[in-house]
Every structure is written in structure tokens, then in C-alpha cells.
Amino acid sequence: MATMNLPTGLHVAAKPASLDRLSSAKNVGDLFFSDSRHRKRVNTSNQIMAVQSLEHIHGVNNNVYANYVNFNVPSSGYSLGQESVYLNSPRKTKIVCTIGPSTSSREMIWKLAEAGMNVARLNMSHGDHASHQRTIDLVKEYNAQFEDKVIAIMLDTKGPEVISGDVPKPILLKEGQEFNFSIKRGVSTEDTVSVNYDDFINDVEAGDILLVDGGMMSLAVKSKTSDIVKCEVIDGGELKSRRHLNVRGKSATLPSITEKDWDDIKFGVNNQVDFYAVSFVKDAKVVHELKDYLKSCNADIHVIVKIESADSIPNLHSIISASDGAMVARGDLGAELPIEEVPLLQEDIIRRCQSMQKPVIVATNMLESMIDHPTPTRAEVSDISIAVREGADAVMLSGETAHGKYPLKAVKVMHIVALRTESSLQKSTSSPSQSAAYKSHMGEMFAFHSSSMANTLSTPIIVFTRTGSMAIILSHNRPSSTVFAFTNNERVKQRLALYHGVVPIYMEFSSDAEETFSRAIKLLLSKSLVKDGQYVTLVQSGAQPIWRRHSTHHIQVRKVQS
């Protein structure tokens, strides 16, 4: 059993006569108290805990207020240690939402942000520049209206997709049926449809397995001519217009960045988006090419590589090293590789990103059923929880928010599952990257000890950063508490919205250290992010001195005083 504490302000409805026994307690918010004859119990978000003692109980207007509640948590074989649980603790795992017809209005973007969206994704496979421009303008309007909140913008390139042609009506494919793909444009008959890629003929061989629409249908390649690939249907279904085609175990020989992608990238530069998510990256050369272009444009945009092709797997280390982060795009990854490999690759990619201090996003099918249904499957809930437990910086919604019927419910489900999972994770007084910290530069060593101190003392971390680098290093040390990152750079504030456990806040820095710290604390108090009398760990990186002319690293533990 581990002892935990709830903070001042815990409210339970009950009659004053029941102060000694909470037998008359009722459900209020997410907290429910009940009573047994010998032992009181507390249920927090369906977690049963045994109450040890209640301090400072008093009744006001027939309500009970508990300033402090001590209770035991069933530890399932491990000790959680002494900690303080704050009811308004921010969620650490970030949420990426794809904006589409269901969510492109001003009202919906505001509601998504309030429900928990941290990053707005623009899927360049759909829509045009005019529609995406409206979304960008609305997100920027939101950011300007709420200074203490931020939504980052991610532009996701279409990439080199092999797509079937248009059909006047869906073609029903049946098991055992012969069906053909032609490189001639405009072909559409009951047994043949065109593809948009001339080298498709050269990319496939007899014996290959073609997957249609992410694996919804599959066909075996039997033979080919100069312009037709002849197949036999293995798993049938309805073939509609413009369906994505994959060859299991192979990637198309198309370039990772197409002409359309370059047009979209230029559009992103002009609109100062925060991230590019680059589709079907096969090697680090593509990343270097894009970064060189961005440097020539003086564009401060970070590059997220989407790991979704078979060719990318042997080059994972170099691809992630060259990038600013990665996305586990499980849809095409599961189409090009055996499906049973996807969970293992997800874990491997997350682990690699953590070791390289790069953010990682887990994407595809996370709440797919909520496109049409108001509640998720239990497997989907488990999927989110696993991604959080494995250490993903962010989880992503695609069709759920782009064109789904219940976009807000999907975000709320993702928010509460991530928050609940985070609350169950074992708290540690050490950093997961201790060995790496001692092998690298001073900044990493400094962040490691800052995180360890904050974990030991159960304090939030306040970091002042110009470039965001110290906040990022702190994030990858995975401190148990929140990292409040104050920066005087709006672009840095936007970018930090993606990082695990980081709450970015814009603030002009003063030459007076005490004045800057005082203003930061005042802002956090006003938002109830810290409370009076609480201790905080204050961090300033010597690599980017804020108050001193010379480089100085320092860590302070201070008591919050309003």
C-alpha cells in the first residue's frame, strides 16, 4: 500500500451530522466517497482506495470540505511512494487533432482546444490551400486571444502514394476472382482499374501481395505485361475510387517529397507553421534536403518524419537522428509489413526517440470506431493507454476529428484515458536517462539532476528558456511533475506544445531575476497551476543565460508566496 494525499479544496456533498462518517456522501464531479462499517473508501475515477484519515473537516451549507485526505492505494506489487495528487494536474501526453469538414469552423476549433487539442494537423492529402489557410488563420486567432494557451500547427504532406483510379460505382471484388491494374489512365471496367503510377509495373513481381485501402482488401500478383498487373483476389470487398495501394514488404520507388509536397511545403513556409510531418521517409537524405531548403528560406519549422514504409526500417537510426521528431504512422506501416510487427516497431521507435531526445507521436486508428459511434471500443482505450505507458509524447486523431460524427467526444476520451493512465504510472525519484546524462554535455547532466530533485521533492519545474532546448531535455527526462516553460519567443512557445509534460508560456524576461520569477509565479497562481505555500524547482540553463551575461547553470527550490 502507498500513501497519497489530496490537496486543499476537496469537496464532498454530505450533511454536517455525517462528518465523522461519510455515509451520506454523494457523487460530486469525479470524486465519490462512501462508507462501510469499519472502513471508509474513496473512488477517484473508478479507482478504489482506502481512506486512512481526514483532516480539517468542516461543514458549510450542508457540504463537507476536506482540506487534506490521507489514503492508501492498492499498489499491485510496487510502491508508489509519498506524493501529492493535484486535481487540476495538467495532462502530460499531448493530443494531435486532424482538422477537416467536421471541425474546420471557428466554433469547433475553439471547442477542440478546450477539450484538449494541443496540435492542429493539416492533412494535405485532402482539401486545398484555401481551406487550410482558413484553419491556420483560426488557430492563430485562438492563440492570439488566449495568451496562456497555445495550439501548434502541423502540416502533413501527402507523400508518394500509389492510388487506384476513379470508378463510376464501387466494384465488388470476390475471393478467387481475377482482377487487373493498368498503368493506362482512365481505365475502369468490372475487372480492371487504372493506377496513377507508371513504374507500378516495375515495382511488383509475381507472388507479391497487393493491399488495397490499408489492407481492407488483398490480391495476389499472378503475372504482368507491359502495362497490366494481373491479380487474384484473396480478401474481397468494395473497391471505390482513389484507394491507396501497397505492396507488402516493399515501398514504391517514388521520391519521398513530390512536386505537390514542395508546393505544400512552400505554403507552410509562407504561413509559418510549426511542424512538417513528412510522409514515407525512406532515408535521412530526404530530411537533410528539406532542412537545407528551410534554412535557405530562414524558416524555423521542425521536421517530423513519418515512419510508414518498409524501406525506412533499416534506416531508423539515421532518419530519426536527422529529424526533429517522429510519427509512428501505423496504417501504411501495417500494410507494408506483417501486422504483428507493428506493436513491436511502435515500442522500438518510441524508445529510440526517447534516447535521442526527439518527440514521438503515435498515430492511426486510435479511436477509429468513434468516427461513427459515440463510444470507443475497449481495445481502442487500451491502445491509447499503451502508447502513454510506452512514453509517447503525443497521440493523434485522424478521421475521428476530420470527418467523424463525434470529434469532441473523441478528444475527451483521449484526454481522460491519457490522464488516467498517467496517474497510474509508477513515480520515480530518478531519471530514466541517467546513464545517457553522464555521457553527454552539461545541459543534459543539469536537466537530469533538476528532474531528480523535482521528483524527490514532488515539485513542479519552472524553466526559463529562449530556445526551448532546456525544456525539451527536461521533458525527455520525464519528471513526475509538470514542466512550466517560460519563453520570450513565440515560435518556441508554439513548438513546445508538442512535448510531453511541458506547459509553454510566453513572457518577456526582465534583467531583474527576482522580478521575472515573481511574474512567472503570479501568472501560475492566477491560473491555479500552483498554490500558495507549495514548493517549486526553478531551473535556468547556462547555455542560454537569461539574467546574467556569462553562462551559469543553477537550480533553486523555492516556496510559492502570493
Curated annotation (Swiss-Prot):
Binding site for substrate: R121, G331, D332, T364
Database matches in Pfam families: PK (PF00224), PK_C (PF02887)
EC number: 2.7.1.40
Keyword entries, A-Z: ATP-binding, Chloroplast, Glycolysis, Kinase, Magnesium, Metal-binding, Nucleotide-binding, Plastid, Potassium, Pyruvate, Transferase, Transit peptide
Cofactor(s), by name: Mg(2+); K(+)
Site label Transition state stabilizer, positions: K306
Family: Belongs to the pyruvate kinase family.
Subunit structure: Homotetramer.
Protein name: Pyruvate kinase isozyme G, chloroplastic
Organism lineage: Eukaryota, Viridiplantae, Streptophyta, Embryophyta, Tracheophyta
